[in-house]
Amino acid sequence: MSGRGAGGFPLPPLSPGGGAVAAALGAPPPPAGPGMLPNPALRGPGPSGGMGVPGAAAFRPMGPAGPAAQYQRPGMSPGSRMPMAGLQVGPPAGSPFGTAAPLRPGMPPTMMDPFRKRLLVPQAQPPMPAQRRGLKRRKMADKVLPQRIRELVPESQAYMDLLAFERKLDQTIARKRMEIQEAIKKPLTQKRKLRIYISNTFSPSKADGDNSGTAGTPGGTPAADKVASWELRVEGKLLDDPSKQKRKFSSFFKSLVIELDKELYGPDNHLVEWHRMPTTQETDGFQVKRPGDLNVKCTLLLMLDHQPPQYKLDPRLARLLGVHTQTRAAIMQALWLYIKHNQLQDGHEREYINCNRYFRQIFSCGRLRFSEIPMKLAGLLQHPDPIVINHVISVDPNDQKKTACYDIDVEVDDPLKAQMSNFLASTTNQQEIASLDVKIHETIESINQLKTQRDFMLSFSTEPQDFIQEWLRSQRRDLKIITDVIGNPEEERRAAFYHQPWAQEAVGRHIFAKVQQRRQELEQVLGIRLT
């Protein structure tokens, strides 16, 4: 069957082999559609050859003065299509058949292959922190009653007032929590009085005839007990300590040195030392026992365990800053305040410090970077001076026990710091609040559902006929979405639906797709690929 189209183009004969059979017989290929390029698989080696057959007419699209009027599809810009000259068979423009734009206005796009759709759908991932914050905000928004419910129930304004108060309270608690977190990072200490008790006892020597037994027997006197000896005890406790947990005495010190009289005990046995180690067990006191029956002068050197560590400044820098012993951070702050007060920072190069005559004597330079100050300051810091206590160990038999008391200032952790840590770590109230929030969300959701049901029934009671028609239209739309129905069956069953301008292009696309399908089948059967 052959003939001519509406635009005067010859229609090729249709055979079961389609375009592939026509190409095998040497017939010219079907011309391309308006505004479409010929299929590259059908083009020959020549610039305008078709199927590689000599004498094939080159493709020439018709101009605007063609016999048929130009048709512009809805939604397309002018000039995007060539004039349509009747029914023509050719490769469609744009994407391949099945994935192109809708064939007619109002028709939804073709459904995507489920396998390809599955590849394009991103895999489920755990929510990011920003998404979790969004969920939290949505939860807060879910607690708000809609305006239509507030208008319907005036008493709900009391609930909205409570919700606004809760929001302000949450903001205040969050701000205080952040302030507590910042405060815990800084050392919170209090100065307390530590009372040190230094006491000694004396045990006189015993004669050989004091006991009926002999040394080494159960009734005798050991040889060590025959020699006079004294015992020195160093203990202490905090005064007015409100904490219930008693702190060990050794925990206040980094080291303890007891220096005895060198003339009595010699250069190798006159020092008793204790230094803190990582494995040190805390104790309530120290005890030293030595033989002797003479009064002994001793010196106690106590090195406090400062947390954070403190340092003693060079005398020149201490006089300049007015700081004797402080932490490194406090020393740096005092140094910066001195630089700022005396305007020693360079006006143009802000990272430099112009040294005055005092700084030149201390740092031995006329100018230095601010980043160099910690390195130069390290050579000017020393360990703090120990606490020195002079004590006399008495061996007077009439005074069996002598006790001396000394009060020193120590820094202990502020009890408020433990309370703040417990407040931040406490989750009891949070769990209770979370459970109440869940109940509120469920109640609000139930109220919204009841409001929807009320609106449904109210609309039905007001206009039953209009309501049922609108409801049926809505149900029909939902049914089409659920069942993936494409098109409009009510319009497609009428003949006028197929007399619209898009029908010609749709038929051309359909015929071209069939020709391509038959061509592929023929190539598969023959085992060759025609070019």
UniProtKB/Swiss-Prot annotation:
Keyword entries, A-Z: Chromatin regulator, Isopeptide bond, Methylation, Nucleus, Phosphoprotein, Transcription, Transcription regulation, Ubl conjugation
PTM remark: Ubiquitinated through a signaling process involving RAC1 and the RING finger protein UNKL.
Residues with Phosphothreonine modification: T217
UniProt region (Disordered), positions on chain: 20-85, 202-226
PTM sites of type Phosphoserine: S203
Matches recorded under PROSITE patterns: SWIB_MDM2
Biased composition (Low complexity): 34-45
GO molecular function terms attached to this record: transcription coregulator activity
The keyword Mitochondrion belongs to this UniProt entry's keyword annotation: no
Subcellular location: Nucleus
Keyword check for Plastid: no
Modified residues annotated as Asymmetric dimethylarginine in this record: R81, R104
Location in chain, cross-link Glycyl lysine isopeptide (Lys-Gly) (interchain with G-Cter in SUMO2): K226
A Pfam family that the UniProt record links to this protein: SWIB
GO annotation terms (biological process): chromatin remodeling; nucleosome disassembly; regulation of transcription by RNA polymerase II
Record-annotated SWIB/MDM2 domain positions: 306-383
Quaternary structure (record): Component of the multiprotein chromatin-remodeling complexes SWI/SNF: SWI/SNF-A (BAF), SWI/SNF-B (PBAF) and related complexes. The canonical complex contains a catalytic subunit (either SMARCA4/BRG1/BAF190A or SMARCA2/BRM/BAF190B), and at least SMARCE1, ACTL6A/BAF53, SMARCC1/BAF155, SMARCC2/BAF170, and SMARCB1/SNF5/BAF47. Other subunits specific to each of the complexes may also be present permitting several possible combinations developmentally and tissue specific.
Protein family per UniProt: Belongs to the SMARCD family.
Record's function text: Involved in transcriptional activation and repression of select genes by chromatin remodeling (alteration of DNA-nucleosome topology). Component of SWI/SNF chromatin remodeling complexes that carry out key enzymatic activities, changing chromatin structure by altering DNA-histone contacts within a nucleosome in an ATP-dependent manner. Critical regulator of myeloid differentiation, controlling granulocytopoiesis and the expression of genes involved in neutrophil granule formation.
Protein name, UniProt field: SWI/SNF-related matrix-associated actin-dependent regulator of chromatin subfamily D member 2
Organism per entry: Rattus norvegicus
